[in-house]
Each structure stands twice: as C-alpha cells, then as structure tokens.
Amino acid sequence: MAVPDFKKSKFPALSPDITDKDILFEDNHLIAVNKRAGDIVQVDDTGDESLDEKVKRYIAKKYNKPNGAFLGVVHRLDRPVSGVILFAKTSKALDRINKMFKSRDMHKTYWAVVRNRPAQEQGTLIHWLVKNPQKNVTKAYEKEVSGSLRAELHYKLIGELGGYYLIEVDPVTGRPHQIRVQLSTMNCPIVGDNKYGYPRGSLKKSICLHARRLQFIHPVKQEPVNIFAPLPKDGFWDRFENF
C-alpha cells in the first residue's frame, strides 16, 4: 500500500457546490450531507464559503425558494474531517435535535486511519480536555484540571492494510478535537494530523478521520434513522471501503 504523499499534494480549489450525490438523507425536517474534507461547516475568520451556505443554496434552488431557505446547524465537524453532517430544515426540528445531542441520544461512529497499531485492539479512553482557542489546539489530561471537560470514547481496531490501521471510534462525548487528541494520547495520531503528532501534515486540508455513521430517532416522525457516509474517493480511503 503506497504511503500517501502529503508533501506533494496540490492545494485544492474551492470546494464545489452541493449536488444530489452529496445528500445522504433528506425529508421535510432534516437534511444530511457527506461533508468533504476542507469544508468549514459555518463561516469563520478565513472568509471561505461555509457548508451551511452551500446547503441553503441547494435547498433554495431545488425547491424554488427565491427568498432563501431556513437551515439550522445541528453539530460540527473539524475542517479537515469528512463525513456525515446533519442540518435542520425547520426551527422545530432544530430545537428537538439540539436537545437530543445534549442528552446524548445521537449515536455517532467515526473511522480513523492511524500509522501505529493500538496496544489494545479495543478499549475506552477517558481524559479531561482543555482547548486553547488562540492556538486552536486541545490538550488532554489524565486527571481533571481547572477548566477541563470530561471526554470519553470507545474504539475498536477493525482492519489493517500495508502498515496502516483502521480504527472505529464511538465518541460518548463531543468535545473539540476529541477523537484527534485522544487517539494521539495512545501513540496513534491520525494520518495527516500533524497538529496532534503525525509527522507530516496534509496540504489537502484533510486528515484520515471520517464521520461514517449517524443513528438516532427522528425528532418528528419518531422513526429510527441510520445515515451512512461513503468514504472519500481519494485513492487512499478507497482501500478501506470493504471493511
């Protein structure tokens, strides 16, 4: 398996508009998109167009809404992370989904590719995290410290190819950079994530962390919803599609 050559990667053009193939789930209340690595979910100080604006434009065009469409941001993914992200199309759905996230009634599953094999094939990681907003870096502590938030996740090794290891992660909490920093604490930094210990960064604005699945009970219809995000088609992730 070829090592991904991050140093020679070309910096990407601005991410294109949302199309039907990017939509993972949609009804009158919710819409889920397969986020591309490099997209920002909401506007920030970079000035780059955000994913929520692209989704608003997609809805307005699809349903002929010249005055624009309502869209509520339910949760976020870090810019270099890909995968399923959910938005609310109505204020009622937004309110109910927000309550579900706070009560941890949303089950999220991520896939991460790391270079080092975990010492234990499965386990639970618990840390106390402190984020430095100026540097946009989160630090993990073994014990509670001033200003820290408890972070918990479960992980399982599910495959290996060419010296790279595929880990499935189920976060219990949703802290900033949680998966990235917690995997790094067990000497398993995510491929491409030099912010948390991988030796080479990615000029593609991407790391090998993908929000693979989101499961919950629909806030209005009260039906089970299981949203599954295909892996990025970038030549590296393709090799893990059959796991």
PLM segments and residue spans:
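RNA pseudouridine synthases
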Residues: 1-243
